[in-house]
Regions:
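Short alpha-helical DNA-recognition segment
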Residues: 24-43
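DNA major-groove recognition helix of helix-turn-helix/homeodomain DNA-binding modules
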Residues: 54-69
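Short, charged recognition helix plus adjacent turn
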Residues: 2-3, 61, 71-81
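A short, Lys/Arg-rich alpha-helix, primarily the initiator
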Residues: 1-22
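Residue-level signal for the short linker/turn that defines the boundary of a DNA-recognition helix
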Residues: 14, 24-25, 51-54
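Alpha-helical residues within the helix-turn-helix
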Residues: 21, 32, 61
Length: 81
């Protein structure tokens, strides 16, 4: 099988809260701008929910960031099979 094998230790982290605060946006403000509920933004910020690719791009655009700068893998245990 081709592709990347992800171990269970790999987590997606984000810097949404910090960049949202920098722009003086509440969770509700950001949620309205990207078309989701405030609870969705909260869950993403806490790492309880991984956004779709589209939502990640929308959030990044609203925060003036690239997706790569806003989201990161917390562990480098990603390997090719």
């Amino acid at each position: 099988m081709f592709g990347i094998h992800y171990t269970s230790d790999v987590k997606l982290t984000n810097h949404i809260k910090q960049h949202r605060a920098r722009l003086d946006l509440t969770q509700q403000d950001l949620a309205e701008r990207v078309g989701v509920r405030r609870q969705t933004i909260l869950a993403i910020e806490k790492g309880h929910f991984i956004p779709s690719t589209l939502l990640a791009f929308l959030i990044a655009r609203e925060l003036g960031m690239s997706v790569e700068d806003l989201f990161a893998l917390s562990d480098e245990e990603v390997s090719a099979p």
